[in-house]
């Protein structure tokens, strides 16, 4: 169940940030810095390599009580006993995923606008990744929806929403005002050489932003 996990700082991996980096060590450093969940997302990597990396990451994430979500690859998620799978508009439908995965695994679903959100509200999903909220280099083909749409999204559904797309230290406070359950980040952490420090700084900013809203 989604409530069993903390998705407040949800790291999403991207091929572009791992050209000269070790995947496992980099994610481990981000965990040491304070991320609470990680989505393993690679589009240009052999399945065997992904499986081997995920096996190691499964142990690390379990030890640190960090949720491990696998993007798109339901087979790999099942094979390594991940906490869940995340699918998009062109991937395997959520209802099909639910029929395949164990009952204790969750399904996340990407939604790019309010119309798609309305459709998603009828699906068997555990959380929604909504965005891109802002312009982002990692999703160049996505139109950004803005804060107004994000706030509307959290108001019209009880399904937990994770904000995604272009979220940085500079706009985090405004994003959290929309009452999201967490933020998905890529470059805000992976865009720095010292990933542990970047994650730690982002975590501190997250805490400060939340405290200002109380």
Curated annotation (Swiss-Prot):
One of its GO terms (biological process) is thiamine diphosphate biosynthetic process. HAMAP family: TMP_synthase. One of its GO terms (molecular function) is thiamine-phosphate diphosphorylase activity. Mg(2+) binds at residues 72, 91. Its cofactor is Mg(2+). Condenses 4-methyl-5-(beta-hydroxyethyl)thiazole monophosphate (THZ-P) and 2-methyl-4-amino-5-hydroxymethyl pyrimidine pyrophosphate (HMP-PP) to form thiamine monophosphate (TMP). Its EC number is 2.5.1.3. Pathway: Cofactor biosynthesis; thiamine diphosphate biosynthesis; thiamine phosphate from 4-amino-2-methyl-5-diphosphomethylpyrimidine and 4-methyl-5-(2-phosphoethyl)-thiazole: step 1/1. One of its GO terms (cellular component) is cytoplasm. 2-[(2R,5Z)-2-carboxy-4-methylthiazol-5(2H)-ylidene]ethyl phosphate binds at residues 136-138, 166, 186-187. Keywords: Magnesium, Metal-binding, Thiamine biosynthesis, Transferase. PANTHER family: THIAMINE BIOSYNTHETIC BIFUNCTIONAL ENZYME, THIAMINE-PHOSPHATE PYROPHOSPHORYLASE. It catalyses: 2-[(2R,5Z)-2-carboxy-4-methylthiazol-5(2H)-ylidene]ethyl phosphate + 4-amino-2-methyl-5-(diphosphooxymethyl)pyrimidine + 2 H(+) = thiamine phosphate + CO2 + diphosphate; 2-(2-carboxy-4-methylthiazol-5-yl)ethyl phosphate + 4-amino-2-methyl-5-(diphosphooxymethyl)pyrimidine + 2 H(+) = thiamine phosphate + CO2 + diphosphate; 4-methyl-5-(2-phosphooxyethyl)-thiazole + 4-amino-2-methyl-5-(diphosphooxymethyl)pyrimidine + H(+) = thiamine phosphate + diphosphate. Gene3D superfamilies: Aldolase class I. InterPro entries: Aldolase_TIM (IPR013785), ThiamineP_synth_sf (IPR036206), ThiamineP_synth_TenI (IPR022998), TMP_synthase (IPR034291). 4-amino-2-methyl-5-(diphosphooxymethyl)pyrimidine binds at residues 39-43, 71, 110, 139. This is Thiamine-phosphate synthase. Belongs to the thiamine-phosphate synthase family. Binds 1 Mg(2+) ion per subunit. The keyword Cell membrane does not apply. Pfam families: TMP-TENI. The gene is thiE.
């Amino acid at each position: 169940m989604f409530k069993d996990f903390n998705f407040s700082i949800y790291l999403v991996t991207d091929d572009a940030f791992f050209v000269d980096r070790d995947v496992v060590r980099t994610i481990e450093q981000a965990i040491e810095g304070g991320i609470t969940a990680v989505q393993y997302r690679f589009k240009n990597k052999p399945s065997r390599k992904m499986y081997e990396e995920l096996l190691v990451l499964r142990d690390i994430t379990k030890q640190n009580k960090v949720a491990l979500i696998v993007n798109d690859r339901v087979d790999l998620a099942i094979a390594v006993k991940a906490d869940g799978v995340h699918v998009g508009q062109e991937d395997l439908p959520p209802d099909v995923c639910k029929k395949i995965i164990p009952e204790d695994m969750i399904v996340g679903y990407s939604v790019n606008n309010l119309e798609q959100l309305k459709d998603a509200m009828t699906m068997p999903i555990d959380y929604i990744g909504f965005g891109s909220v802002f312009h982002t280099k990692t999703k160049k083909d996505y139109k950004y929806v803005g804060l107004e749409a994000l706030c509307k999204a959290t108001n019209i559904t009880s399904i937990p929403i994770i904000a995604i797309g272009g979220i940085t230290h500079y706009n985090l406070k405004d994003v959290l005002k929309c009452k999201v359950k967490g933020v998905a980040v890529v470059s805000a952490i992976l865009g720095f050489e010292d990933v542990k420090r970047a994650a730690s700084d982002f975590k501190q900013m997250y805490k400060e932003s939340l405290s200002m809203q109380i």
